[in-house]
Amino acid sequence: MQTSISTTTIEDHLHHYSPEESQKLLSRESSINTDLFKHENESVDLLLKEMNSTPSKLLPIDKHSHLQLQPQSSSASIFNSPTKPLNFPRTNSKPSLDPNSSSDTYTSEQDQEKGKEEKKDTAFQTSFDRNFDLDNSIDIQQTIQHQQQQPQQQQQLPQTDNNLIDEFSFQTPMTSTLDLTKQNPTVDKINENHAPTYINTSPNKSIMKKATPKASPKKVAFTATNPEIHHYPDNRVEEEDQSQQKEDSVEPPSIQHQWKDPSQFNYSDEDTNASVPPTPPLHTTKPTFAQLLNKNNEVNSEPEALTDMKLKHENFSNLSLDEKVNLYLSPTNNNNSKNVSDMDSHLQNLQDASKNKTNENIHNLSFALKAPKNDIENPLNSLTNADISLRSSGSSQSSLQSLRDDNRVLESTPGSPKKVNPGLSLNDGIKGFSDEVVESLLPRDLSRDKLETTKENDAPEHNNENFIDAKSTNTNKGQLLVSSDDHLDSFDRSYNHTEQSILNLLNSASQSQISLNALEKQKQIQEQEQTQAAEPEEETSFSDNIKVKQEPKSNLEFVKVTIKKEPVSATEIKAPKREFSSRILRIKNEDEIAEPADIHPKKENEANSHVEDTDALLKKALNDDEESDTTQNSTKMSIRFHIDSDWKLEDSNDGDREDNDDISRFEKSDILNDVSQTSDIIGDKYGNSSSEITTKTLAPPRSDNNDKENSKSFEDPANNESSQQQLEVPHTKEDDSILANSSNIAPPEELTLPVVEANDYSSFNDVTKTFDAYSSFEESLSREHETDSKPINFISIWHKQEKQKKHQIHKVPTKQIIASYQQYKNEQESRVTSDKVKIPNAIQSKKFKEVNVMSRRVVSPDMDDLNVSQFLPELSEDSGFKDLNFANYSNNTNRPRSFTPLSTKNVLSNIDNDPNVVEPPEPKSYAEIRNARRLSANKAAPNQAPPLPPQRQPSSTRSNSNKRVSRFRVPTFEIRRTSSALAPCDMYNDIFDDFGAGSKPTIKAEGMKTLPSMDKDDVKRILNAKKGVTQDEYINAKLVDQKPKKNSIVTDPEDRYEELQQTASIHNATIDSSIYGRPDSISTDMLPYLSDELKKPPTALLSADRLFMEQEVHPLRSNSVLVHPGAGAATNSSMLPEPDFELINSPTRNVSNNSDNVAISGNASTISFNQLDMNFDDQATIGQKIQEQPASKSANTVRGDDDGLASAPETPRTPTKKESISSKPAKLSSASPRKSPIKIGSPVRVIKKNGSIAGIEPIPKATHKPKKSFQGNEISNHKVRDGGISPSSGSEHQQHNPSMVSVPSQYTDATSTVPDENKDVQHKPREKQKQKHHHRHHHHKQKTDIPGVVDDEIPDVGLQERGKLFFRVLGIKNINLPDINTHKGRFTLTLDNGVHCVTTPEYNMDDHNVAIGKEFELTVADSLEFILTLKASYEKPRGTLVEVTEKKVVKSRNRLSRLFGSKDIITTTKFVPTEVKDTWANKFAPDGSFARCYIDLQQFEDQITGKALQFDLNCFNEWETMSNGNQPMKRGKPYKIAQLEVKMLYVPRSDPREILPTSIRSAYESINELNNEQNNYFEGYLHQEGGDCPIFKKRFFKLMGTSLLAHSEISHKTRAKINLSKVVDLIYVDKENIDRSNHRNFSDVLLLDHAFKIKFANGELIDFCAPNKHEMKIWIQNLQEIIYRNRFRRQPWVNLMLQQQQQQQSSQQ
């Protein structure tokens, strides 16, 4: 759509001007003195006028001053004109050139006649016809031949054409200038009459010919010798106006301008090669809405033919709006199968045009871009009015063409010394569009300084190159992708780039208007002049062009400037071979730039419009070859065609740069490695040739290949001897045409590549990192005496890959190219950075919808390929995406920032069709890709494949075409957030390391949320203050074996203890460290009150002293701990091991008195320990159960050594038994070889050390040898069932194995039996337990030391927790705050243990005593310290309002009253607040803290273990401040401000699976339930089998508490005592339906009627049979209650609390 619109717009604009005016625009001499870029406004005006002018008006322009046109006549052609219609064909069909003509860049002496003939041709044909007249290479070749033959006949300059037609066949990019109007014989005639009108800016065969005409080269239009050609008066606007008014070409007076003296510009030959017209607005060629409407209103005889020509290529984008509207709306056209999308795009263009109002934007932008220079010559006018005829090859035309091509082409030439066009720029670009594309859309404005310099020199190249580099990467990408006709749009887009100056467009338009013959003549002249200039320029590869500029300072400089600018674009544009074509284009661009400088804005617009028409015609002819690319590449490609006849003309824009790149890279896959060398050598050769052609060598060759080839082809005209020299000679011509240099600038990209070795991924990546970096690299390359790498346009690369031959790569002098290229890079960097804009989707939504613009690095839709390969330093022939028609932008290392090609028509289709193309989301992020690239720089492409194998392979097609396979691979680097260390999911876990990741809260409180500690440092103060308790005392209390222990719950798992002990803040165990080694240091200095408080022994409150009374024995509640076991019973999971230190006898009974009870209890304890051993052998359960106790606690904890297990439960921390219980178990256990549950013997004993239980060990068998005889108080049950252990005196401990399995049985109904194979494990677990206890005493440091101990089975809580402290704050009392009632204070209480903190709700502090009643559950590690902080908020007292009355005496207002001395009294009443002193102002911390209490569990542990006691805790105010006089506020000493009345209960944990109570209330409720159980009583007759009865025997049984006493049936003597607390299950028939009568009973066991079984923890069974069902139900109910409680009563803490109750009761008695 853009193309069609642009062509139609150009045509419409061309129609606005009369032929004379357009001729004036074309014939205007480009004043050397004027700087084309000083006034971009005028150039824009010229462009607008040109766009508004009719083609007929532009055509006659060629008639004027043929001499001037001849050098510039080639630039007058659409190819040469800086402004080309967007529809201008990228690929110019190969123009048929007269074999005698040296090249398209040279114009014969008859260029004037050719210009006239071309005028005639244009008169006969519209611009659209010219654009689309020649759709195939044959037509183009014919037109080219006509154009070339005519100028050759007229000029009669010997030119060697090596198979012109063949060279310009569509196999090569159509960069040769074409007289598209010559399609008809009338066209040929016109071309004869107007040779200069249409010169194929793309390098003709003559240009590409290695042999140049032997005749001396004509003068270069832009050489300094022809200053009159480029007259740029200071008042450029006025002169432009005058030039616009002039119908005949008039030479404006020469005015000193930057073009006049190329030396004053530090441009390398590339810069000189790219004539730099002021950067046109991005959419200069795009018609405005008004133009589109006018165009629709205009009646054109051409549209149909032009439409047909365009449709021949099925390129609807080339159609104008009218054509498309007619095509879609007309009945005939409606029948045609056309893409509605084209119409939509056309409508979209209309809409965009209406919105954007391109004309106004162009004018405004042009004025904004306008340099201080007043007048800007229309380069078209300068061309038409050029007094100096271009020499044989018409290099100036080629330069104009190159300029035009550069305008069209994305500035791909890295070496072109273009300056940044600081126009409109999107810093971030437009999403979905490459920066280059956006630049093309946005008019870019060179800084006026840069405009003046870069307009002439850098703007064409720099704009073109940057445009080409940045844009041609996109355009060239698109063009490379489209590579031929389909990429016309991208080529047009390339013209739309902001980087292309309007003057570039104008120059390209003027060049395109110049006939091919004129171009050839001019190229020949330029070749000659360049050869002359090249001789001095040979010194430096690009300095050749510079020298050429210097020699023809006026023209050459101008030409060089233009050449430099356009060569950038042209070089970047040309896909086949940028070097030559770009150089030719550069020459043409210079000519064009010279003209644009001369052209007034109007004439420039006319010339541009005419040029656009010619461009449209050229595009028509060159559609297949890349219309727009061909235009700029037409000159470049003509050069390249001279160089490589075999090359297919491809997008001249892309080819200009990319051809150079492609030629350099694709012709040589090794060029990537050799790019720097090749480009440098090429630049050198080119510089040499340009030095030979010094006169015309304005633009140093930019593309190493193209420039080399071009230089060689030009050297052939100058010197037929060496093809390289021939190429260089035309290349020097192309130096005049900066496009060649721009292509040379493109070689600097290749230089970048050469700099980066193919395998040197890192350096290559650095080169390719950013386009700016690329520019900087280009700048570095562009330094004058540095070799310039071959410019690599992705399009040119792609074209080279597909169409160019590697052997065609020619080395070009790189020094000058580098110098110009460096400037270009500098300018380009600034420009590229500014130019990085993206075309909005509205502009080319359809075409780019599929294009993957992942980043600026994305050169082609196969982004991953580029990214993965990271712009392979080596360009392979197939590195370009052939199937996708993508230039291998990844190969363009110079362009780290890939840009999607502007024309993605083919790209989209190919992307859709190509499965290898990966969608943009698929490619990794560019950061990842870059990293992957960097990582994989030296790795093979197969490795790249993992990231994007499909795309890699399309890109690897380059490896297929390329003999070189990219050695870069992007590793499949994929961050998996679930597993990768880089994943942020666990990023913040370290924040919670202090209280353990995922650990349970160490503080719990109902209705309160547990948060991380906020006062950890304050909690440390307790530890510090405890040092006041003498170091030895503290160590003895807290450590075993003098080894540091964890000091608080704030400890991490023991596994990490060794790591954390030195770093743990709260629980720092390094007590003997230097800090803690001074016990008095902290207590005496820092917190003496705290030290004293911690040293003070706590005193439990008596009931009389309790202010907040609560019931000690709480009523039974459903939340009793007993309920929890009941719930757990159904779960069949052993939360707690049955083996526990427990009192088997009921707490109400005296265990010592009852031998049965003693025996049973002993057996129970034994079983419990066996269970512990079996179930927790690796866990040291006993050690866990029996936590290390301070030495002070040891006395209370253990009472007996023999039955340590029994005694352990009596310790404050673990349930212990009395000595009386432990004395008999040995006897009882030895009595029963079977170890029935009724017989209990303790198989282990507790090992004490330093007052703490260090572990347990099996009791010698002699002491615990079971007794086989019944002693009366024991029942020897020989009948063990369900896995019972056979009686064996020698395996007593082994007989306890069932208890090991009984842990689950305690909680489940499943029988818990232990096979005999477990017997061997018994002793070993005990040893492990022993070790583990000892290990725990050493803070588990020995855990690693003892491999046998495996703690993995023990929950971490077992390692960290040794009990629970229930801390209930009953209330605060004795609050020492004044005026509590008036302040209406509210306070909260925060408990902080250094790990977590919990804050209570607010309480009203309206009295000195406030009830709180909140209970906290704190996890106790080896030690526990915590603080309670009270924080208050209150209302500051408000002062009362006091009424104040004020009286004032005022003179009376009445005069009479005043006379009498009367006065008025005014009374004023005010309410003044009285200040109230806030008595709380200095008593609170900023956060409201006013009281703090420090608690150390060690102080209270002995007293509160197993029983709850109340205490008064002093709270201190540490925040009160006071001031003495004027001194600042100072914090006073802490003082007691309140007291907390608290109740504390410490419940030690004996087993990690032990279920502890949840509160003080639940603990006592559970104990009360057990106590009430002792009151249960039932009796009756039962038959017993099992235990001591081998057969069923009737007995009388009494159920008392948990004891079932068996009595003789008759005498009722006690025969046995069965400890029901050991029963784990009750088995009877039909438990579920016991209360139902109508049911059938099914059971797995044999049971008698009314029978039931009780199962013990060791698996032993005893059968009972009731006399009747009723009694059976009563027995079952009672037994079930007991069994239900058994799961709870086995808890060691229950036994402990029961024991404490007993002691308390006994003490009270």
From Swiss-Prot:
Compositionally biased region (Basic residues): 1325-1342
Residue spans of biased composition, Polar residues class: 78-108, 255-267, 687-697, 1186-1197, 1286-1315
Cellular compartments annotated: Cell surface; Bud neck; Spore, Perispore
Keyword flag Manganese: no
InterPro entries per record: Bud4 (IPR052007), PH-like_dom_sf (IPR011993), PH_domain (IPR001849)
Record field: compositional bias (Basic and acidic residues): 10-27, 111-122, 448-464, 595-623, 641-655, 662-671, 704-715
Low complexity bias locations: 67-77, 389-402, 953-962, 1222-1235
Keywords for the protein's UniProt record, in alphabetical order: Cell adhesion, Cell cycle, Cell division
Keyword Cell cycle: yes
PH domain: residues covered: 1575-1684
PROSITE patterns per record: PH_DOMAIN (PS50003)
Span list, region Disordered: 1-27, 67-125, 192-281, 387-429, 448-472, 525-549, 595-746, 937-968, 1186-1349
Annotated GO CC locations: cell surface; cellular bud neck; cellular bud neck contractile ring; septin ring
SMART domains noted in UniProt: PH (SM00233)
GO molecular-function terms, A-Z: cell adhesion molecule binding; GTP binding
GO terms under biological process: axial cellular bud site selection; biological process involved in interaction with host; biological process involved in symbiotic interaction; cell adhesion; cell-substrate adhesion; filamentous growth; filamentous growth of a population of unicellular organisms; nuclear division
Role summary: Required for establishment of the axial budding pattern in yeast cells. May be involved in the selection of future sites of septation in hyphal cells. Contributes to morphogenesis and is important for induction of hyphal growth. Also plays a role in epithelial adherence, and is involved in intestinal colonization and systemic infection. The role in adhesion is probably minor compared with its role in morphogenesis.
Family per record: Belongs to the BUD4 family.
Full protein name: Bud site selection protein BUD4
UniProt lineage: Eukaryota, Fungi, Dikarya, Ascomycota, Saccharomycotina
